[in-house]
Amino acid sequence: MRVLIAVLATALAGLVIAAPGASAQTGLTGVEASSTGLISDEGFVSLGTTLECAVPTSGATLSATLEQENSGGTSSAFGFGGHDVLDSFCEPGGSPMAIAFGSPEPPFTRGPAVVSMEGCAGGECMTGEETVQLRDGGRTVHASVPADAQSLLELGVSSRAVLETSGVVTLGTVIDCASVSGPAFSGTLEQRQGKRLSEATVSAFILGGCGGLHPEALSFTPVAGSPAFEPRKARLSLTACAGPAGADECAVVEARLKLIDAD
């Protein structure tokens, strides 16, 4: 089963600095980060970001470093966005790009941290530095994976997700797989609003192959015409697949998540 694409994330406000010679007429015009990141059980951090371009532009990338001074010393980790097949598209009004950071030593803790970003699109780059609040992502909910699995070895999602001011929902996942391609994700997030249903979807295919246990951050984009999500429980169904072409192994996580407002 081959699932395709578009990891989307979110976000919102901060200091943006144009690289020397960058034009406001074409290419990249903004780099922003969400105000809130979530720490998973495993110590990974998921964070929503947004890239904005004056005209639709493909090949967008974002590299970021998250750093925090805490009681254990200095925690620092690197994250990269733009390795999803469709996630590298940047357009006017902003395109979400979720970023996941690994677990450093000492680990990240709840509280403020600084994210330094460099976004590039259309041959132009911009940098930004913002203070974000790291919060508890809740327990990890795991999928049931067969004991004899060869490609997809583990899949889990944090029980909390960030409801961004844009309406996008940023969710942290953990995955362990042995595959030369993928992993691929597809899923829906639903919340009952009286007689109406709020719905958001994600479809993502990550380039570069899949190794040991690591984080992947996903952005669920609201379906057109769907009522806005509220900061309360929502139901998730997420499928992940990995493996050689035509022989994917897949796992499904069904969970109730708590949506929390970005600070």
What name fits each language-model region?
Residues 1-24:
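Secretory targeting and sorting signals
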